[in-house]
C-alpha cells in the first residue's frame, strides 16, 4: 500500500477517543479530502504490519505512546505517507508544503507528532531497526529482573532512536527536510509567547492557558501556517470528557478554532444544547410543568 496520499494515525482503544480529538481529525478531512485517513488500533494493525515486525512484548511492556512511536517508524518505512498524531489540527491548506515535500523524510524540528515519508525511507528503516533492538533489550533485562529505569524515558522508542538518524542525514536534502516548528507555528503557544515578548512560564501551564483557559482563536487564525500540534497528555481531563457540543460552547481558543475553520454554527449548537438541558430538567422534575 505505497501511497503518499494516506494519513496514518493510532489510537487504542478506538472506542475511547475523546470527542475533541475527533474534531482534530475532522480538520484533516476538511482541508485534504483527497487523502485517505487510516486509524490504526489493535484490531487492524496486523493488516498493515507483517507478523513479526516487532516482538509481541512491544504491546505488553510499553505504554501506548511508546507503542505508537514504534508503529509509526514501521508504517512509514513499509508504506510511506503522512503520520499525524490524533491531536493534530489542520488549520488551512497552507500545510500542503509539508504534505507534498519531496524529501524521503520530513519533520518539524524533531517533533515526531507530524511526519512525512516515502516508502523505504532510510531514516525510517534505521529507526525501525533500532526500535526492534531496543524492544528486545528491554525484554531481556526485564526477564532477568534487571534495572529498567534507564528504559523508562518517554523518548525510548521515539526521538531516542530517531535523533541520531536525523543528525546523520541532516545535510542530505534528498533524505530529510527539517522544518522549524516555531517559524512554521505548529507549536502556537510557543509562537504566542514570543510575540508577547514573554518567554517565561511552564510549558504545560502555557499550553493549558493558551488553548483551554482563554480565547486566542483570532490570534491563531491570523498567524497560522496550516497546522497545530496539541499535547493531549497535557489537556485538562475535564475537557477530554466533554461531548462535541459541550466542548464547542466552552469559548476557548480550541473551540473557537474548530467553530471557525469547520464553519460550524455556534448559535444552533447552543440552542440545541439549551433545549436538551431543559428537557433533562423536566425529566428530573416532572411536577414542575404539570398544570
For each predicted feature, which ranges?
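Glycosyltransferase-associated regions of secretory-pathway enzymes
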Residues: 1-68, 84-291
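Small-residue hinge/turn detector
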Residues: 69-81
